[in-house]
């Protein structure tokens, strides 16, 4: 029996970038598609996946089974432009992660802005619109983050994904006018992200802690 069916309440429904989520809490997991069904059972509002380094095409084709069943956010890092094009038709949200592409903690922001412009231009080639978010690393300075936020808003990026401890600061910088997705490793951090005003929160929680998070979210005073 699924413990989460009782937590699918109207109060938890949320919308983001034209997408409807049954709740704002998601799970970030390994590339394995086998776990996607489990994530749905846990009650995840969305699932973030990163394509494997090998056999990417086979992996992408496997996503078709889950289309329209789970909101899929695909984290794109290696071979950004090519991978972006491959996953576009199979993703509900694409997260650009330039840090992993460069293999360092915080790539030069000029390199990042060039990458963002490339993927925004690529999106123009498609008939349907898929939102794009930028994952901002721990290593960027406040000035660098401010510059990236300005570029995102001007270039057509739909949101940023930031570590839990930076959610409040980023929202203050944008005066709560630009969507932020928090990235959290604990229940407490996930709750703080949402209470600060994050549109969504992506977690690395295992099943039981994730259940507890949904229970917290379902409480009227949360």
Language-model segments: which ranges?
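Metal-dependent enolase-superfamily TIM-barrel catalytic cores that perform enediolate-based chemistry
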Residues: 82-139
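Alpha-helix-loop-beta-strand connector modules within alpha/beta enzyme cores
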Residues: 56-70, 109-134, 165-180, 210-222
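N-terminal capping/small domains of soluble enzymes
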Residues: 1-81, 214-217
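Glycine-rich phosphate-binding active-site loops on the catalytic face of alpha/beta enzymes
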Residues: 49-52, 93-102, 159-165, 189-216
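Glycine/Thr-rich beta-alpha phosphate-binding loop at enzyme active sites
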Residues: 3-7, 98-114, 136-176, 209-216
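Active-site-proximal loop/turn and secondary-structure-junction residues that shape catalytic pockets
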Residues: 31, 53, 78, 98-102, ...
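Hydrophobic faces of well-ordered beta-strands that scaffold small-molecule active sites
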Residues: 23-29, 45-49, 70-76, 94-96, ...
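Catalytic cores of alpha/beta
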Residues: 36-40, 82-86, 140-154, 170-178, ...
């Amino acid at each position: 029996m699924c413990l989460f069916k009782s937590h699918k309440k109207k109060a938890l429904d949320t919308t983001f970038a034209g997408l409807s989520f049954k709740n704002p809490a998601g799970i970030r997991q390994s590339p394995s598609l086998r776990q996607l069904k489990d994530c749905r059972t846990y009650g995840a509002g969305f699932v973030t996946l990163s394509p494997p380094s090998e056999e990417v095409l086979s992996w992408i084709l496997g996503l078709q089974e889950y289309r329209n069943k789970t909101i899929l956010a695909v984290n794109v890092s290696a071979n950004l432009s090519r991978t972006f094009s491959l996953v576009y038709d199979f993703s509900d949200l694409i997260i650009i992660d330039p840090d992993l592409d460069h293999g360092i903690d915080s790539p030069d922001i000029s390199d990042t802005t060039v990458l963002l412009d490339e993927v925004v231009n690529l999106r123009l080639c498609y008939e349907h619109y898929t939102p794009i978010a930028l994952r901002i690393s721990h290593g960027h300075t406040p000035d660098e983050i401010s510059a990236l936020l300005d570029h995102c808003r001007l270039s057509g990026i739909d949101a940023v994904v930031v570590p839990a401890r930076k959610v409040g600061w980023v929202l203050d910088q944008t005066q709560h006018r630009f969507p932020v997705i928090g990235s959290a490793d604990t229940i407490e951090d996930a709750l703080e992200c949402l209470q600060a005003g994050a549109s969504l929160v992506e977690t690395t929680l295992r099943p039981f802690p994730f259940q507890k998070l949904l229970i917290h979210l379902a409480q009227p005073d949360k």
